[in-house]
C-alpha cells in the first residue's frame, strides 16, 4: 500500500476507535508492524502504548485489518466501475466516504456483472424507454398506458401483446428500484429499527424433549434481539423444528418506495409503477435485507457467545494452582471402573490403578474397591483427591467422602471440570507422554494435574473441547478458534512459565515461540540439563534474536545464576533494575526479602525515574518484580473449594445456605456446583440486587460463591439457586 493509502486506513481506524488517543493507535500499529507480539507489547512497551492491555491492542489490530480490507475493496470497486466507463465524481466520492463494507457493496450493486436477468432481456428488446415513460408519471392528458405500450409491440422480439410489453417494463422498473443504494439503505434501517424476528413451529414431533417449545410462537424486535435466543432459534431452524423469518410492516415500505419512484402520484401509470415497486421489494430487496439482518444478528450473537466462552476459558485457565500437594486423580465410570492416578507435587506419576466401586460391578469387586483406594491414599500420603465431573461423578464423590473418613491422614477432595480430558488422553501429546497407559488412565492423570496447575494441563487440549460456554458448536468455528487461541496465549504470558519444567505444549504459547522452537527448548533441556540462565536460550536451535526478545521475559528460572531470571523483568531492563536496587541501598541478594520490600516501598519514585530514565509504568513493574520474585498472579485468587463430605438432592431445603463453585456462565445466568448430583442454576435476576447487564459482570468460572437454595425439583433433577442474601 502507498503512504497515502496507509494514512487513509489509519484515519479510518482512529475515527472508529475514538476511545484511544491517535498516538496510541499509531504506536501500537508500528510495534506490530515491527514484528512484536501482543503479550510483549502489553507487558514491556507500556510507556509507548499508554498501558493498553492485550484485549485493547488486539482490538486495534483487528480494526486496522478491517479498515485495510475495506480500503482494498473500495479500490477494486472503483476500478471495475471505471473500466465500465460509468464512474462519476459523485459515485467515486460516495464509495471513498463509505465506512462499512455493506455500504460499498450497496453502491456497487447496480454495476455488478449480473447473470442475464429478465430486466436485461427486456432492455435488449428495447423496453427501457417505455419503463422510463411509466416512471416519469404520464398524466391523463397523455396517451393511455395501453396505447403507449402498443408502440413497442414487436413479433420478432416476442412482444406480441400489450401484456408482454407491460411485463418487460415491470421487470426493468423492479430492477432499477432494487439496485438503488439509497432505497436499500432506508429499508434496511427501517427493518432494523421496526422489524420482528419471528419463529413458528414447523415440526413439533421432532422436538421430543420440547427443547424449542418456547420458540413455537415467538417474536422479538430486531433491534432488541437477545443473542442466546437468536442462536437457539437458528439451531431450531437448522434441525427443521422451527421456521424463522423477519416480519416488518410492508405497507409502510411500499408507501416509501412509491413516493420515491413515482414522480407523479396521480399519474395514469401509478398502479403499474406501484406494482413493480412492491414486486421489487418482495422478490429482491426484502429477501436480501432479511438475509443481511439475520446474518448481522447471528454474527452479533456469535460474538457474544464467543466472548462468554473466552471469558469462561480465561477464568478456568487462571484457576489458582494447588502447589506442593500429592494428588490422586479419579476418572469416574460405572461399567469400566474408576481409573486412578497418583501424581507427586511436580506432576510426576507415582502410581495408577482401577477400582470398581459402582454397579454393575459384582459385589466382590465393589467390596474390594474401598480397601484398595484407602491403601493408595495411605501408601503415597495423598493429600487431595481430584474427581472428574463426568459420568458417575456424584456416586464417586459419595464413595470418596466415605473412604477419606476412614484414613488417618487428612484428605480433601475437589470436583474438577474434566471437559476435554478424553480428547487429551487420545491425543498425540498424551500418547507421547504416556505411551504405555490406557486412554482412561491418561484422563485420570490429566484430572489430577488440572487441580495442581490448570493452565499447564489445559494448554494440551484444543480449547474448543474445554466446554465452558453456550452454543459453541453453532458459532463461527474460525472466529471461536482465533479468540480462544488468543485467550490461551494471553493467560500463559500473564502467568509466565518455569523454563525448566514447562512442557512443549505450554512453551509454544509463550510470545515469540512456536511448536518447533518449544520442542527444541525441551530437547535442549533434556540433552544439556536444566537452564541456569536466560541467556542460554540463545543456544537453542531456531530461537533467533527476535524470538529471544519477545519470549525471554515470560520464562522464569528458579534457583539460577541470576535471581533476576526468576522475575518478569526483561533482560533489557536488568541494568535499570540494578540501579533501582542501588538507589534503595540493596543488592541482588536482597531481592524478595522483607528488607527489600520495605526499602523499595519507601523509594522516592520520582527521583528513581529521574536517576534511571525509566518510565512510570516500567519502574512500577521492576519494583514489583524485585519485591516478589517468582510471583504467580494466580496465587491472589481464591483456592478451589475443598470438601470432605457430600450432599444429596434430598438434603436440600429452600433457604439453605451453601458454598459452591461457578462451573459455567451463560447469557441467562450461572451454573454452580454445590456438591449434589446436578449443578444448580442462578438465574440472572437472582445474581444481585442491582441491575445486571450480563452474568459475567458478577461471577466468573471458578469463583467460590455463597448461594441459597430457591427451590428443588427432584423429579427433573433441577436446583434453582439465588445469590440474593436471605432475610
What spans do the regions from the language model cover?
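Long, highly charged, low-complexity intrinsically disordered interaction regions
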Residues: 8-9, 68-86, 96, 432-530, ...
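Single-stranded RNA-binding regions, centering on S1/OB-family and related RNA-binding modules
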Residues: 560-561, 565-727
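Generic start-of-chain signal for non-secretory N-termini
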Residues: 1-26, 33
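Duplex nucleic acid-engaging cores and interfaces of nucleic-acid transaction enzymes
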Residues: 53-59, 66, 70-329, 333-436, ...
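Short, ordered loop/turn segments at secondary-structure junctions
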Residues: 44-46, 249, 332, 345-346, ...
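Structured, non-catalytic alpha/beta "coupling" segments that mediate domain-domain communication
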Residues: 94, 107-108, 236-251, 260-285, ...
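A glycine-rich phosphate-binding loop feature that marks nucleotide/adenosyl-phosphate handling sites
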Residues: 189-196, 330-334, 390-395, 416-423, ...
Amino acid at each position: 500500500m502507498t503512504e497515502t493509502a496507509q494514512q487513509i486506513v489509519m484515519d479510518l481506524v482512529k475515527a472508529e476507535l475514538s476511545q484511544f488517543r491517535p498516538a496510541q493507535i499509531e504506536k501500537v500499529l508500528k510495534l506490530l508492524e515491527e514484528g512484536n507480539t501482543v503479550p510483549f507489547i502489553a507487558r514491556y512497551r507500556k510507556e509507548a502504548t499508554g498501558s493498553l492491555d492485550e484485549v485493547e491492542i488486539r482490538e486495534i489490530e483487528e480494526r486496522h485489518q478491517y479498515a485495510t480490507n475495506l480500503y482494498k475493496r473500495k479500490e477494486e470497486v472503483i476500478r471495475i466501475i471505471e473500466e465500465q466507463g460509468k464512474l462519476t465524481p459523485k459515485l467515486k466520492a460516495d464509495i471513498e466516504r463509505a465506512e462499512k463494507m455493506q455500504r460499498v457493496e450497496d453502491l456497487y450493486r447496480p454495476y455488478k456483472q449480473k447473470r442475464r436477468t429478465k430486466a436485461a432481456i427486456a432492455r435488449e428488446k428495447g423496453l427501457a424507454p417505455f419503463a422510463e415513460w411509466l416512471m416519469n408519471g404520464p398524466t391523463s392528458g397523455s396517451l393511455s398506458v395501453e396505447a403507449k405500450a402498443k408502440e413497442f409491440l414487436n413479433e420478432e422480439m416476442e412482444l406480441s401483446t400489450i401484456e408482454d410489453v407491460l411485463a418487460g417494463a415491470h421487470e426493468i422498473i423492479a430492477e432499477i428500484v432494487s439496485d438503488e443504494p439509497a432505497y436499500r439503505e432506508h429499508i434496511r434501517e427501517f427493518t432494523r429499527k421496526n422489524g420482528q424476528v419471528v419463529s413458528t413451529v414447523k415440526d413439533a414431533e421432532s422436538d421430543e424433549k420440547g427443547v424449542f417449545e418456547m420458540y413455537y410462537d415467538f417474536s422479538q424486535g430486531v433491534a432488541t434481539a437477545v443473542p442466546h435466543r437468536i442462536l437457539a432459534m437458528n439451531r431450531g431452524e437448522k434441525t427443521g423444528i422451527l421456521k424463522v423469518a423477519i416480519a416488518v410492516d410492508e405497507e409502510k415500505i411500499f408507501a416509501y418506495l412509491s413516493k420515491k419512484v413515482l414522480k407523479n402520484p396521480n399519474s395514469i401509470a401509478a398502479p403499474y409503477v406501484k406494482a413493480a415497486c412492491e414486486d421489487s421489494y418482495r422478490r429482491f430487496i426484502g429477501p436480501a435485507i432479511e438475509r443481511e439482518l439475520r446474518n448481522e444478528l447471528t454474527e452479533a450473537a456469535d460474538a457474544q457467545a464467543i466472548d462468554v466462552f473466552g471469558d469462561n476459558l480465561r477464568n478456568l485457565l487462571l484457576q489458582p494452582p494447588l502447589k506442593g500437594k500429592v494428588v490422586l486423580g479419579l476418572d469416574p465410570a460405572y461399567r469400566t471402573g474408576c481409573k486412578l492416578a497418583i501424581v507427586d507435587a511436580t506432576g510426576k506419576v507415582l502410581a495408577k490403578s482401577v477400582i470398581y466401586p459402582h454397579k454393575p460391578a459384582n459385589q466382590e469387586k465393589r467390596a474390594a474397591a474401598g480397601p484398595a483406594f484407602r491403601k493408595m491414599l495411605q501408601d503415597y500420603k495423598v493429600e487431595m483427591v481430584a474427581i472428574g465431573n463426568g459420568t458417575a461423578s456424584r456416586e464417586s464423590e459419595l464413595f470418596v467422602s466415605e473412604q477419606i473418613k476412614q484414613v488417618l491422614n487428612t484428605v480433601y477432595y475437589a470436583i474438577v471440570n474434566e471437559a476435554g480430558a478424553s480428547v487429551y488422553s487420545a491425543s498425540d501429546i498424551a500418547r507421547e507422554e504416556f505411551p504405555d497407559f490406557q486412554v482412561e488412565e491418561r484422563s485420570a492423570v490429566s484430572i489430577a494435574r488440572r487441580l495442581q496447575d490448570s493452565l499447564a494441563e489445559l494448554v494440551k487440549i484444543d480449547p474448543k473441547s474445554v466446554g465452558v460456554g453456550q452454543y459453541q458448536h453453532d458459532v463461527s468455528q474460525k472466529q471461536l478458534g482465533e479468540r480462544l487461541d488468543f485467550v490461551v496465549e494471553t493467560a500463559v504470558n500473564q502467568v509466565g512459565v518455569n523454563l525448566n519444567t514447562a512442557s512443549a505444549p505450554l512453551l509454544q504459547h509463550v510470545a515469540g515461540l512456536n511448536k518447533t522452537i518449544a520442542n527444541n527448548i525441551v530437547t535442549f533441556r533434556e540433552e544439556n540439563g536444566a537452564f541456569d540462565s536466560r541467556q542460554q536460550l540463545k543456544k537453542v536451535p531456531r530461537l533467533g534474536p527476535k524470538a529471544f526478545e519477545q519470549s525471554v521475559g515470560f520464562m522464569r528460572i528458579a534457583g539460577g545464576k541470576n535471581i533476576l531470571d526468576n522475575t518478569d523483568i526483561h533482560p533489557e531492563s536488568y541494568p535499570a533494575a540494578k540501579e533501582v536496587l542501588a538507589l534503595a541501598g540493596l543488592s541482588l541478594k536482597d531481592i524478595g526479602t522483607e528488607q527489600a520490600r520495605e526499602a523499595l516501598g519507601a523509594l522516592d519514585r520520582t527521583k528513581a525515574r529521574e536517576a534511571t530514565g525509566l518510565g512510570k509504568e516500567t519502574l512500577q513493574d521492576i519494583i514489583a518484580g524485585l519485591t516478589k520474585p517468582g510471583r504467580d498472579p494466580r496465587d491472589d485468587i481464591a483456592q478451589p473449594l475443598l470438601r470432605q463430605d457430600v450432599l444429596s438432592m434430598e438434603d436440600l431445603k429452600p433457604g439453605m445456605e451453601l458454598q459452591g463453585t461457578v462451573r459455567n456462565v451463560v447469557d441467562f445466568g450461572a451454573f454452580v456446583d454445590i456438591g449434589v448430583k446436578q449443578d444448580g442454576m442462578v438465574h440472572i435476576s437472582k445474581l444481585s440486587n442491582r441491575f445486571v447487564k450480563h452474568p459475567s459482570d458478577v461471577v466468573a468460572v471458578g469463583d467460590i460463591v455463597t448461594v441459597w437454595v430457591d427451590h428443588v425439583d427432584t423429579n427433573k433433577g433441577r436446583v434453582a439457586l439465588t445469590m440474593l442474601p436471605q432475610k
